From Swiss-Prot:
Protein name: UvrABC system protein C
Family: Belongs to the UvrC family.
GIY-YIG domain mapped to chain residues: 15-100
Quaternary structure, from the entry: Interacts with UvrB in an incision complex.
Compartments where found: Cytoplasm
PROSITE patterns the record matches: GIY_YIG, UVR, UVRC
One annotated GO molecular function: excinuclease ABC activity
Gene Ontology CC annotation, any one: excinuclease repair complex
Source organism phylogeny: Bacteria, Pseudomonadati, Campylobacterota, Epsilonproteobacteria, Campylobacterales
GO terms for biological process, alphabetical: nucleotide-excision repair; SOS response
Keywords: Cytoplasm, DNA damage, DNA excision, DNA repair, Excision nuclease, SOS response
Record's function text: The UvrABC repair system catalyzes the recognition and processing of DNA lesions. UvrC both incises the 5' and 3' sides of the lesion. The N-terminal half is responsible for the 3' incision and the C-terminal half is responsible for the 5' incision.
SMART domains with a match to the protein in the record: GIYc (SM00465)
Length: 600
């Protein structure tokens, strides 16, 4: 009967472009794809005789997915390009089981110069600056701030955005005071050109910094010399060692993919003025039952790296190999940036060699990662708790409050083998009980899935009730996220937390688990829970201190602790109390107290 329903749904497919979605019997999203012709594309997944089943001509991954499929949905679009953009958005937001999700939602910094200014200076941005005479350099995947500091250390350029008289940088010979007309614009621009040349040629900057470090050491200014030494080390780390001579002073980008032993590696080179100025690599472990899709990866990689709100410095993108939607991506990027963008596969010459180099480095990154990390704990968690995903990206949640005061929530993130502190999040909460607080935190996180892709696993500090709550929110979001909860053992109806040795219980959608205190899986989950708890407690303590300080100000006005608590209970925070209408305050705490608040 179920397959009959699916067969009827197949008959409704139009001959237009669009996005299709496959669901299993539990209503979970299995796969998102795009099509130039929905009817032809979707029907190619199936064989219709004697009964509806997976087309044996497709890959094993696709056949397995189709055997699980009981329902499909589609969205028709005006063009295949629109369908591709929508497909990418769905994959990022919903993380379907059989799609590979690249988790790189970061925006990387650019160094730029605004030549509209009389005396231009270097600045950092992560977005497009809406001015006509901007020159960008980057993106820099690491060390942008240190590189900027190194430029300002050696080249005496203006550092402050606005300055009417010589500042401290002039006094220490780090600026030539253009604000006071102590240098002409022509001479200043000559120094700026030298600095730009050094930015594009790190070896030049290194030589200059090494000279400066030597002078500082000879003058026994060892502290400053040590700072320069550290900057030299950072710039050496930034350099991409390439034995390829790029004859022309071109700007272009290079992408390559490698896949080995269920690990995907992506690599990107940024080339400006014929020099590789930065490189970025990413490692993504893939479940054994998913075959990697080269076309799918290139689409995600290029669309995510060339979003509308960043500067596009190169008109040409070189890729290591051909992929199905290359021409379609050219069309999308050309429309997005209102100029011709080409995606090419070089066959010979220096461009071919640099693409080969990118691929070789992507392979080396896989070997390096597998030497350092074998993903054992992730594989054990997936097998033992029967998870859908290999839990490489884990978000862990905890709340903290003191009798309904300073209510906060916290989320920490663990990726592959380390904490990703750039993804930690703090939440000020309105509710006072643990259940409603966790609902508030998880709902706010789920609403952000379109901006920050969902993880593989949520780990909740709590029991079955909070596990069921998390399931409700994930089902509502439509995302593919596994859920575990960890609760402290209860003795005499009291929960006990003994760091590292507590007999915690693990709750999954499959049941409840009591593991030995020596079990590596339990110890790993405890480590995750303890970090979330530490982060939540720290945020709670800081919030409480701030609230106590503000509370003491109201107390100094002569308001009793009871009145202050009444105000907080009603308005939620001190800012709202001070902004409250006088009449409302009078109704709540009386005219005398209201006057004290508004007068101060």
């Amino acid at each position: 009967m179920i397959k009959e329903n699916l067969e009827n749904e197949l008959k409704t497919l139009p001959n237009s472009a669009g996005v299709y979605q496959y669901f299993n019997q539990e209503g979970k999203l299995l796969y998102v794809g795009k099509a130039k012709n929905l009817k032809n594309r979707v029907k190619s997944y199936f064989a219709f005789t004697p009964n509806l089943h997976a087309n044996p001509r497709n890959s094993l991954r696709i056949q397995k997915m189709i055997e699980e499929t009981v329902h499909l949905e589609f969205i028709a679009t005006n063009s295949e390009a629109d369908a591709l953009i929508l497909e990418n958005s769905f994959i990022k937001q919903l993380h379907p089981k059989y799609n590979i999700l690249l988790r790189d939602d970061k925006t990387y910094p650019y160094i730029y110069v605004d030549f509209e200014e009389e005396f231009p200076r270097f600045e950092i941005t992560r977005k497009l600056v809406k001015k006509s005479k901007i020159k960008y350099f980057g993106p820099f995947f690491k060390g942008a701030r240190e590189l900027l500091d190194a430029l300002y250390l050696y080249y005496p350029l203006k550092q402050k955005a606005s300055c009417k008289s010589p500042c401290i940088f002039y006094q220490i010979s780090r600026c030539l005071a253009p604000c006071d007309k102590l240098i002409s614009r022509e001479k200043y621009l000559e120094i700026l050109d030298e600095a730009i040349h050094a930015l594009l040629n790190p070896s030049v900057l290194l030589k200059n910094l090494e000279k400066q470090m030597l002078v500082l050491a000879q003058n026994e200014n060892y502290e400053e010399a040590a700072k320069v030494r550290d900057q030299i080390a950072m710039i050496k780390d930034l350099e991409v060692k390439v034995e390829i001579d790029i004859a022309k002073l071109e700007d272009f980008e290079v992408f390559a993919l490698a896949f080995k032993n269920s690990v995907l590696s992506t690599l990107r080179f940024v080339v400006q003025n014929g020099k590789i100025i930065s490189a970025n690599s990413k490692i993504t472990p893939i479940r054994n039952d998913i075959q990697w899709d080269q076309n799918e990866i290139y689409k995600q990689l290029i669309l995510e790296n060339f979003s509308m709100d960043i500067p596009l410095l190169a008109n040409v993108i070189y890729v290591y190999e051909e992929f199905e939607d290359r021409v379609l991506l050219e069309e999308i990027l050309s429309q997005r940036f209102d100029k011709k963008i080409s995606i090419k596969i070089p066959k010979i010459g220096e461009k071919r060699r640099i693409c080969d180099l990118a691929f070789q480095n992507a392979l080396l990154n896989i070997e390096k990662e597998q030497k350092n990390h074998d993903f054992t704990i992730q594989k054990e968690l997936k097998f033992y708790f029967e998870l859908e995903n290999l839990p490489n990206d884990i978000e862990i949640f905890d709340n903290s409050h003191l009798q309904g005061v300073a209510n906060v929530g916290a989320m920490v993130t663990y990726r592959i083998n380390s904490w990703d502190k750039s993804k930690y999040r703090k939440f000020h909460l309105k509710h006072k009980n643990d259940y409603d607080q966790m609902r508030e935190v998880l709902t706010r996180r789920a609403l952000d899935f379109d901006k920050i892709p969902p993880p593989d696993l949520w780990l909740i500090d709590g029991g079955k009730a909070l596990l069921d709550l998390a399931k409700e929110i994930i089902v509502s979001s439509g995302a593919n996220v596994d859920i575990l909860a960890i609760s402290k053992e209860k003795i005499d109806a009291k929960a006990h937390r003994a760091k590292g040795g507590a007999k915690d219980k693990i709750h999954s959608l499959k049941g409840e688990f009591s593991l030995s205190i020596n079990d590596k899986k339990l110890q790993f989950l405890q480590k995750l829970r303890d970090e979330a708890h530490r982060f939540a407690i720290s945020f709670h303590q800081n919030t409480k201190k701030k609230q106590d300080l503000k509370s003491s100000k109201l107390a100094n006005l002569g308001l009793s602790s009871g009145v202050i608590q009444k105000l907080l209970a009603y308005y939620g925070n001190f800012e709202s109390i001070y902004k409250a209408d006088f009449k409302d305050l009078t109704m709540l705490v009386g005219r005398k107290a209201a006057q004290k608040i508004k007068e101060n």
